[in-house]
């Protein structure tokens, strides 16, 4: 029994001596950013445009993720209003900020699925088709915008949670 304990103790000491001096390489040039949601900013009772400008100018944020909530850009079926997205991308571009533009039904910030009121009465298949149309419209509108460096298609699309979300068909 003592031999077993001694062997385990020696092994533990050896492993400690081998791995203790190991220091993982510290990452360099980490790029931090923020997700900015005008909708959430407004729920806090704040002026989203001035807050956005302050984030860009005062905090010097140069990496952003911007949701394009379906309920905001198509409040009525077939009527698109991209004015808020235009503003954010143009202001980001003026400051050489990079933007990940989020498109689709499921996007950052609760309730996850930002479905316009008019689309909630549609069947899941009809809603799916309308979602594809708004994604197509948004991508075509911003595909050449200098501030858009990446696209995020849906946010956690295969997770089954989220208020008013259709079940994923994966």
PLM features: what roles do these ranges have?
Residues 20-62, 67:
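Boundary/entry segment of secreted carbohydrate-active catalytic domains
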Residues 24, 94, 140-144:
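Secondary-structure boundary motif
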Residues 32-36, 64-66, 99-103, 149-153:
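Hydrophobic faces of well-ordered beta-strands that scaffold small-molecule active sites
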């Amino acid at each position: 029994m003592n031999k077993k304990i001694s062997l385990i103790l020696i092994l533990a000491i050896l492993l400690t001596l081998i791995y203790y001096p190991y220091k993982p390489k510290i990452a360099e040039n980490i790029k931090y950013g923020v997700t900015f949601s005008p909708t959430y900013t407004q729920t806090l009772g704040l002026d989203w445009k001035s807050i956005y400008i302050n984030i860009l100018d005062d905090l010097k944020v140069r990496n952003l993720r911007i949701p394009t909530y379906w309920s905001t850009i198509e409040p009525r079926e077939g009527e698109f209003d991209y004015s808020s997205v235009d503003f954010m991308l143009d202001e980001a571009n003026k400051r050489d900020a990079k933007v990940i533009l989020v498109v689709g039904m499921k996007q950052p910030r609760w309730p996850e699925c930002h479905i316009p009121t008019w689309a909630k009465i549609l069947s899941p298949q009809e809603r799916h088709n309308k979602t594809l149309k708004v994604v197509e419209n948004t991508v075509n509108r911003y595909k050449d915008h200098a501030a858009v460096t990446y696209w995020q298609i849906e946010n956690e699309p295969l997770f089954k949670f989220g208020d008013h979300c259709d079940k994923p068909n994966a």
